[in-house]
Amino acid sequence: MASNLDAVQRLVFAVIHHDDADTAGQALVEAGHRATRIDAQGGFLRRGNAVFMGGVGIEQVDDVIATLRSVSTHAFGQSGTGSAYGIVFVVPVDAFDRL
């Protein structure tokens, strides 16, 4: 989700429905964001899902979320909890480097 090491100020974790993962990955690339995808099951959404994570600048967070929201079409629903298309966590980054 970032190409400039100095610009990485936030780490974005996005958990989305597995059926939206390929489209989401492509949309992130087309929007100029780099991300790592991890396929997972269980956890917050209780079904097959994908976790995208990547470092971004503060000014890119809203664009990443909007990009993911625009391609998320499969809702997760649980009895009594309503439904959601995904969950996004944004965490401050103190340091970032590539090995």
What are the residue ranges of the model-derived segments?
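Positively charged, small/polar-rich N-terminal and surface patches that mediate targeting and assembly
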Residues: 1-99
